[in-house]
Curated annotation (Swiss-Prot):
<keyword id="KW-0742">SOS response</keyword>
<dbReference type="InterPro" id="IPR020588">
    <property type="entry name" value="RecA_ATP-bd"/>
</dbReference>
<dbReference type="GO" id="GO:0003697">
    <property type="term" value="F:single-stranded DNA binding"/>
</dbReference>
<dbReference type="InterPro" id="IPR023400">
    <property type="entry name" value="RecA_C_sf"/>
</dbReference>
<dbReference type="GO" id="GO:0003684">
    <property type="term" value="F:damaged DNA binding"/>
</dbReference>
<comment type="function">
    <text>Can catalyze the hydrolysis of ATP in the presence of single-stranded DNA, the ATP-dependent uptake of single-stranded DNA by duplex DNA, and the ATP-dependent hybridization of homologous single-stranded DNAs. It interacts with LexA causing its activation and leading to its autocatalytic cleavage.</text>
</comment>
<dbReference type="InterPro" id="IPR013765">
    <property type="entry name" value="DNA_recomb/repair_RecA"/>
</dbReference>
<keyword id="KW-0547">Nucleotide-binding</keyword>
<dbReference type="GO" id="GO:0005829">
    <property type="term" value="C:cytosol"/>
</dbReference>
<dbReference type="InterPro" id="IPR049428">
    <property type="entry name" value="RecA-like_N"/>
</dbReference>
<dbReference type="GO" id="GO:0140664">
    <property type="term" value="F:ATP-dependent DNA damage sensor activity"/>
</dbReference>
<dbReference type="InterPro" id="IPR020584">
    <property type="entry name" value="DNA_recomb/repair_RecA_CS"/>
</dbReference>
<dbReference type="Pfam" id="PF21096">
    <property type="entry name" value="RecA_C"/>
</dbReference>
<dbReference type="InterPro" id="IPR020587">
    <property type="entry name" value="RecA_monomer-monomer_interface"/>
</dbReference>
<dbReference type="GO" id="GO:0005524">
    <property type="term" value="F:ATP binding"/>
</dbReference>
<dbReference type="GO" id="GO:0009432">
    <property type="term" value="P:SOS response"/>
</dbReference>
<dbReference type="GO" id="GO:0016887">
    <property type="term" value="F:ATP hydrolysis activity"/>
</dbReference>
Length: 365
């Protein structure tokens, strides 16, 4: 008797669900008539339900820390930190990666300070990079909106939020008080941009600067410019800090680069609060080889014994800088390591099945 009752209850639930689905379908038809096709769809039929596409950062260790293999498409990203900490370098490296994949990038240079020589050294095809140097903050953000709506741009970089000066402030006198103008400008622009970003699959990066809050006795006195809107709308927030200077071997005065620390303070697409250290060489950008070496050691593809580094039974060299230099010369080996690491990290590849190309030992030691 209980089985019959249970069967009747299941049939009743099925009928109820069917009637609910019919009601939702009727509502969907009405919604699409009013707002257009695709206004309401099941998540399994939407690109949102099929995972988030990404743009490589140019560093495998940062790609791993970001959780999805790079910067998420269709999202807002904020990169902030003190001066000369590597913020612009990170964005230019991302532009170079987009262009390598055949994508299109734009740089909105509100600071009017983009160095094409440095960008080219980082691998950016400056001849194909779209550049805008707007006069006002409104102009910059409207240009960004038009580019996003075009659907043809893969990556937009805005440098920087602090330089997005409202027109009213530019037209006013130097001593005029213009409290909250920039914050209101950013809030309005981000409300408009957010909805169209996901549909166009465009990634937009905002470079931001740090300011000190007056009168803060306890806690962190640092804050970013442009109000709180960007903090809320950003899916990814990266804090960049300079850790130490890198000097040429055998010299304490010949500085050739910086080591920076990137902390992911907010991440809506993967676990946040991860930290990575990157090496930036002056005139060259982020060291791809240093990132590959760190990742290979972490995932046991390269073994470190004392100051010696080895790949299987073959020694790569003694000392970190020596091995990085060796990997920069052995391009085929470096590319192969990168390929294998990405399989290990992002595809749960069985490390025991990883086989490396033939290569010669580092004979410089």
């Amino acid at each position: 008797m209980s089985k019959l009752k249970e069967k009747r209850e299941k049939v009743a639930v099925s009928i109820e669900r069917s009637s609910k689905e019919e009601a939702v379908e009727l509502a969907r038809v009405q919604i699409e008539k009013t707002f257009g096709k695709g206004s309401l769809i099941k998540m399994g039929e939407s690109p949102v339900g099929k995972g988030i596409k990404s743009i490589s950062s140019g560093s495998i260790v940062l790609d791993e820390a970001l959780g999805i293999g790079g910067y998420p498409r269709g999202r807002i990203i904020e990169i902030f930190g003190p001066e000369s900490s590597g913020k612009t370098t990170l964005t230019l490296q991302a532009i170079a990666e987009v262009q390598k994949e055949g994508g299109i990038a734009a740089f909105i240079d509100a600071e009017h300070a983009l160095d094409p020589v440095y960008a080219k050294a980082l691998g950016v095809n400056v001849a194909e990079l779209w550049l805008s140097q707007p006069d006002t903050g409104e102009q910059a953000l409207e240009i960004a909106e038009h580019l996003i709506r075009s659907g043809g741009i893969d990556l937009i970089v805005v440098d920087s939020v602090a330089a997005l000066t409202p027109k009213l402030e530019i037209d006013g006198e130097m001593g005029d008080s213009q409290i909250g103008l920039q914050a209101r400008l950013m809030s309005k622009a981000l409300r408009k941009i957010t909805g169209i970003l996901s549909k166009s699959n465009t990634c937009i990066m905002f470079i931001n600067q740090i300011r000190m809050r007056i009168g803060i006795m306890f806690g962190n006195p640092e804050t970013t410019t442009g109000g709180n809107a960007l903090k809320f709308y950003a899916s990814l927030r990266l804090e960049v800090r300079k850790v130490e200077q890198i000097t040429r071997s055998g010299s304490s005065d010949d500085v050739i680069g910086n080591k920076i620390r990137v902390k992911i303070v907010k991440n809506k697409v993967a676990p946040p609060f991860r930290k990575v250290e990157l090496v930036i060489y002056f005139g060259k950008g982020i060291s791809r080889e240093a990132g590959i070496l760190d990742a290979a050691i972490k995932h046991n593809l390269i073994q470190k014994t004392g100051s010696w580094y080895s790949l299987g039974d073959n020694k790569l060299g003694q000392g970190r800088e020596s091995v990085i230099e060796y990997l920069s010369k052995e391009v085929e080996l470096t590319n192969d390591l990168d390929k294998r690491l990405r399989k290990v990290i992002f595809n749960n590849f069985d490390q025991e099945d990883v086989s490396f190309i033939e290569y010669k030992e580092n004979e410089s030691e």
